[in-house]
């Protein structure tokens, strides 16, 4: 994109794309860095910030560690019976090198499964599965991805994910992002209020989407 724009003497470049799951959102992706490089050459970069306001797609708060008496923070999303996504993506971002060490999933039927030591796809029964991945950016942002899938539509009801950090990490900032394959900026599966509310809440902080998270955007 950079050489294409330079060869054509571009003065302004407009991007109409916005993603909020599966990204570090800290300016370190290849596209974000390319935007910075083109901005440095004088090409104005215009990037949409997204439209996630009041969409229940973003959670922000404090992640406790496993020894915190307040317990883990529980995030949850709802799948409605009349609007079943085949895939729902959850991304949790923890800056400054902090990370999540405890992950426990509670399915709509109330059964629980530990995902703390998982890094691949797990069969959850009833056609549901979850794929777990972790990564770290060059700015030391840790990313946990959970991808829930069912070719016939995810089991309806409330899905809960309880999270905590390692012993001694204390309470640290985290954000959670949710998206699915049947909705866009709003609708579909969405976050429910996290618990306890003293640790985290649904809000609009951190709702700028990729690649508007580039340093120069």
Each model region followed by its residue ranges:
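Loop-rich non-cytosolic ectodomains and luminal regions
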Residues: 1-217
């Amino acid at each position: 994109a950079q050489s294409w724009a330079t060869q054509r003497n571009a003065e302004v470049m407009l991007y109409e794309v916005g993603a909020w799951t599966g990204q570090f959102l800290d300016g370190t992706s290849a596209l974000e860095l390319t935007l910075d490089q083109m901005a440095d050459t004088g090409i104005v970069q215009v990037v949409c910030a997204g439209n996630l306001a009041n969409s229940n797609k973003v959670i922000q708060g404090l992640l406790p560690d496993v020894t915190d008496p307040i317990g883990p923070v529980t995030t949850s999303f709802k799948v409605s019976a009349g609007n079943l996504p085949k895939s729902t993506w959850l991304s949790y971002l923890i800056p400054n090198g902090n990370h999540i060490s405890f992950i426990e999933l509670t399915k709509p039927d109330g059964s629980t499964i530990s995902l703390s030591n998982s890094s691949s796809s797990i069969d959850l029964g009833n056609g549901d599965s979850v794929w777990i991945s972790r990564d770290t950016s060059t700015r030391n942002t840790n990313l946990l991805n959970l991808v829930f899938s069912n070719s016939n539509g995810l089991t309806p009801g409330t899905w809960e994910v309880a999270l905590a950090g390692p012993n001694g990490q204390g309470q640290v900032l985290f954000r959670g992002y949710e998206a699915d394959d049947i909705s866009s900026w709003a609708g579909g599966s969405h976050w429910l209020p996290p618990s306890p509310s003293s640790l985290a809440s649904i809000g609009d902080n951190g709702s700028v989407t990729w690649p508007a998270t580039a340093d120069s955007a």
